[in-house]
Amino acid sequence: MAGAASPDHLFGLRNSFYVGAYQAVITGVQAIPARAALSPDALAERDSLLYRSYIAIGSHQLVIDEIGPGAATPLQAVRLLTVYLSGGAGGKESAIRKLNELLADDAVGSNPILRLVAGTVLMHERDYAGALKHTNSGGTMELLAMNVQICLQMHRSDHAEKQLRIMQQLDEDHTLTQLANAWVDLVMGGSKIQEAHLIFQDLSEKYPATCLILNGKALCLMHMGNFEDAEGLLLESLNKDAKDAETLANLVVCSLNLGKSASRYLNQLKLAHPDHMLVKRMSSAEDSFDRACQAIS
């Protein structure tokens, strides 16, 4: 009789990470029993989940300090992501250059975490075609989910739907498949908004109420015109993380639709995330208004 399959000690960590329960990942890593015989690949995945969670909560220096130059490729990639996110223009350029060197190395260039980090960095750079170059071949559910995000950013919902169908064929019940389905539904609009809301509601019953889940539910309510209930969810999210970019951005939009002042949330967003797309759009609108005033003065 065949032996029982060994338990997947990273299953819970992955799902916690996917829904934005980063502290649960950090504490969950400590809870993995010492006797668990993790393979080298599993150890690298465990550590990448851990350090990516630290990045998500803003502990950039810890990641930079703990990942040494001799670390495995996935961890080197995660460290470069930290350098990119925490550094100025020089740090960003250095991180991108070193990422490109790793990607060009035939021995490690196909590593999925490396490709995922490359996609993440290039999405931040708004180089969506470049990001897709590294993620399009897939290989993991995370890479496929990133393909969906990139296609939606490129306003190619048709391609996003194709990527979603691949995910559904692989594992329809996977947490990332459910999230990707909700993202596509939100963009499609109409009756799909209710379907997206049901997905986020289901996730909220399975997992802690994270900023990601609360923002997802709030976005659905905003699409349905229910800004008051959306505001309540967003304020709950703000209590969990006062600097969360999407929470602040959605509160700006929600407040404006409720006829309330959004200046405090916008100022917080400018301070914490000066490169956020909403900040840039608002700044561009202000500049256009100023130029128009000067033209008629």
UniProtKB/Swiss-Prot annotation:
Keywords: Cytoplasm, Cytoplasmic vesicle, ER-Golgi transport, Golgi apparatus, Membrane, Protein transport, Transport. GO terms for cellular component: COPI vesicle coat; Golgi membrane. GO terms for biological process: endoplasmic reticulum to Golgi vesicle-mediated transport; intra-Golgi vesicle-mediated transport; protein transport; retrograde vesicle-mediated transport, Golgi to endoplasmic reticulum. InterPro entries: Coatomer_esu, TPR-like_helical_dom_sf. It comes from the Eukaryota. It is found in: Cytoplasm; Golgi apparatus membrane; Cytoplasmic vesicle, COPI-coated vesicle membrane. It is a peripheral membrane protein. One of its GO terms (molecular function) is structural molecule activity. Belongs to the COPE family. The coatomer is a cytosolic protein complex that binds to dilysine motifs and reversibly associates with Golgi non-clathrin-coated vesicles, which further mediate biosynthetic protein transport from the ER, via the Golgi up to the trans Golgi network. The coatomer complex is required for budding from Golgi membranes, and is essential for the retrograde Golgi-to-ER transport of dilysine-tagged proteins. Oligomeric complex that consists of at least the alpha, beta, beta', gamma, delta, epsilon and zeta subunits. PANTHER family: COATOMER SUBUNIT EPSILON, COATOMER SUBUNIT EPSILON-2. This is Coatomer subunit epsilon-2. The lineage of its organism: Eukaryota, Viridiplantae, Streptophyta, Embryophyta, Tracheophyta.
